[in-house]
C-alpha cells in the first residue's frame, strides 16, 4: 500500500468525499480526537499529546471535547496544549508555558501552577480579565470536578 486517503461524509445524506479537501478546522479537531481515541483502544500508548485540539470549536462542542479527553485520561496520560477554558478547567495539573527574551535570545519557561484558577480566568477574559472571570473560572473547575467524580462511581 503506497498511500491512504480518508473519506468522510460529515453530514447525513452527503456522499463520501476526501477528508483533506472538505474538512474544516473544527471538524479536523474532532476527527483527530476520535481517531486517537480509537487508536488508544488498540495500541499500548501510555501518553497522548494534543496540540490545540480545540482549534475551530467552541461552546457545547468544546465541552464534549473536554469530556472525551477526560475519559481518555482515565487510562493514559494526556498532555494538552490549549487556549480553551473548558478544556483547561478539566485538567488535573496545569503548566504555564511562556517566553521571554534575555541577552538577545528567546527563552521558554515551563512552570507548574499550584492554583490554576487565575489561569483559567485569564483564558476566559484575557490578560486584564475582570473580577467576573474568577468566579466563572471557579464554576468551570467545579463543574469539571463533578464530571470527573461521576466517572469514578
Residue spans for each PLM region:
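Conserved nucleotide-binding/hydrolysis modules and their immediate coupling elements
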Residues: 1
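C-terminal lobe/lid and adjacent interdomain/linker elements of RecA-like ASCE P-loop ATPase modules
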Residues: 4, 60-153
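GG-anchored amphipathic helix commonly corresponding to the ABC/SMC/Rad50 NBD signature/C-loop
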Residues: 5-6, 10-13, 18, 27-48
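Conserved D-loop-proximal element of ABC-family nucleotide-binding domains
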Residues: 17, 42-43, 55-63
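Pre-signature/interface helix of ABC/ABC-like ATPase nucleotide-binding domains
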Residues: 17-21, 108
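ABC transporter NBD signature
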Residues: 24
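Conserved helix-loop functional segments at active or binding sites
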Residues: 37-41, 59, 71
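Walker B catalytic acidic pair
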Residues: 51-52
